[in-house]
């Protein structure tokens, strides 16, 4: 892998870019709509140079529509999609997700998927494609259950309702007595029974279908009565669908992830090395774990 930095407003650097485009399979750009056109690197221009090119434009709201030119970031895309409205605190304030869901799950991953589809299509037809990847659009498929429920019943779910938005005792985050937290998700009846038996939940509090609030409060009270270590020991070896809410530091040291080799890849730097970030690529497509150099390339070498 190599890299190059170009000033696309420079005539020489722009010519370098055009020379690379002539030989490229894929071009990915993440400017606001219209910027590549102003730079003289629109799809029409690149297609004229390279008819088979896969031209992937990743933007917030897409290449068309009334919101296409709006300045926005990940949080804004999640807000517009309705995703933020479904989880929050007891006062109804939406929670602040600490993951760039739109950038990764609604931007990079759909781009990769559509690029692969376009390459397959080109192998059959010889034609390239312009891929309009809108992060705002691609968050909506993640709400398939909420959208589906609304279409079927005429009422869309809101915060604190439904199976995965806080309306069920079987899909919750509960506090322990030492202020740690457990993610509890025994959705299926067989898991729910094992879970209830394990925490010795009274039979009168187990009918969460008829009395969801009472069941939720009973589970919360029970789990808050003992520390995390007690519950982890109690759940050991049982199919209860319970997992401690790890800190990032704890996740980094998790023996399961270590066994899976997620942090074995390292990148050489001028002052030593750094752990490479995990990527969702199957190990059969990657080099064995080890120390790798970071991408380097000087302008003169590329020009």
Give residue spans per PLM region.
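Active-site-adjacent "lid/gating" segments in soluble enzymes
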Residues: 37-182, 186
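Alpha-helical scaffold segments in soluble metabolic enzymes
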Residues: 19, 114-118, 194-198
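Flexible, small-/acidic-enriched active-site or ligand-binding loops
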Residues: 267-303
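Aromatic-enriched alpha-helical interface/lid elements that frame and gate functional surfaces
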Residues: 165, 169-242, 249, 303
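Alpha-to-beta junction loops
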Residues: 23-24, 51-53, 237-242
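Short acidic-hydrophobic surface loop/beta-edge motif
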Residues: 172-177, 263-269
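A structured beta-alpha segment of the ubiquitous adenosine-cofactor-binding alpha/beta core
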Residues: 2-48
